[in-house]
Amino acid sequence: MGKRDIALRIKSVKEVRKITRAMYLISASKFQKAKGMLDRVRPYYYRVQTVMKDILLHTGEVTSRYLEKKDVPEKQDKRKVFLIVTGDKGLCGAYNHNVIKASIELIKNEKANLKVVGEVGRRYFIKKGYDVDRDFLYTAQNPTVDLAAEIAEILLKEYNNGDADEIWAVYTEMKGLSQKVRTLRLLPLDVENFMSIAAEEEEAVEEHVVIDSDMIYEPSPSEVFDAIVPEYLKGLIYSILVQAFASEHFSRMVAMDGATSNADEMIEKLTLLYNKLRQASITQEIIEIITGASV
C-alpha cells in the first residue's frame, strides 16, 4: 500500500468517524430526553396503580373482565396478541436482535397476531411469514402519551371484543444504565404480577401515596376498577415505549462510541504507517542524492 492509498484511507476513516461521533451525540441527547419523559409520567402512573392496588387489597372480591380467572378451565387454543417494540433503524448493537429473539421464543407455535412498533421488527416478522397486523404502523421514535393512548385503545378493543384472549408485550426495559428484554402479559391482569409491578414503581417514585383503607368506591369497586384499567394500560404502554426508546439510544450510544474509538485507533495506526513510508521515502531520496554527488 503506497502513501497515496494510505492518505486516502485516513481521509475516509476520518469521515466515518465524524458520522459515528455525530450519531453518538444525537443518541445521547435523545437518551436524556427519554429519561426525563419517564420521570414525568411516573407519578401519574403510580397513582393509578395505587388506586387499583387498594381496590384489590381492601375491597374483598373484585370481579372484572380484566382480571385473570383462576377458577375457570384454561382455554386450549388461546388467541394471543403480541405488542413487540423494536427500533426503526439499526446501528444499535444487539438491541433489535435481542427483542426479536425473545419474541420468537415467547410466540413459538402460538396462534398469535403481532403488532410491531418499529420498522426493523416489522420487516423481519413479515419476511418470516408471521401474522403481522399490516395496518398497525407506529414508529419507535419520540413516543407520546397520545400514541400510547391510541395503541391502548386498539388492544383494549380486541380484548373486549373477544378477538384476543391474552395480550403480551415484548420490549427492552431500562433501569439506570442496565437493559434487559422483558416479556409482560398486559391482559388479563395477573394479581400477583400486578402487585409486583406496583411495588417496583413504588420504589421508583419519590412521593408515596397513602390511601385510607376505609375508602368507599362508587358505584362499586369492580366498576371503578374496570374504569381505571384503560388508564393503567395507557400509562404502562407509554412507559414501555419510553423505556424502549431510551434503551435503543443507549445501545446506539455504546455502539457509536465503540465505533469512534475503533476509528481513532485505525487513524493512529495508518498515520504511523504513513509516516514510516514517508520517512523511508525521504531517507531513500537522501541516499540517492549522496550517491549521485559522490560519483
Curated annotation (Swiss-Prot):
Please provide an example of a Pfam family that matches this protein in its UniProt record: ATP-synt
Membrane topology of this protein: Peripheral membrane protein
The UniProt transmembrane annotation reads: none
Q: Which GO terms describe its biological process?
A: proton motive force-driven plasma membrane ATP synthesis
Provide the alphabetized UniProt keywords: ATP synthesis, Cell membrane, CF(1), Hydrogen ion transport, Ion transport, Membrane, Transport
**Compartmental location:** Cell membrane
Q: Which SUPFAM superfamilies match?
A: ATP synthase (F1-ATPase), gamma subunit
- MF terms (GO), sorted A to Z: ATP binding; proton-transporting ATP synthase activity, rotational mechanism
Q: How does it assemble?
A: F-type ATPases have 2 components, CF(1) - the catalytic core - and CF(0) - the membrane proton channel. CF(1) has five subunits: alpha(3), beta(3), gamma(1), delta(1), epsilon(1). CF(0) has three main subunits: a, b and c.
Q: Which NCBIfam families does the entry mention? A: ATPsyn_F1gamma
Q: Would you identify the family this protein belongs to, as annotated?
A: Belongs to the ATPase gamma chain family.
Protein name per UniProt: ATP synthase gamma chain
Q: What species was this sequence derived from?
A: Caldanaerobacter subterraneus subsp. tengcongensis (strain DSM 15242 / JCM 11007 / NBRC 100824 / MB4) (Thermoanaerobacter tengcongensis)
Q: What is the lineage of its organism?
A: Bacteria, Bacillati, Bacillota, Clostridia, Thermoanaerobacterales
Name the gene: atpG
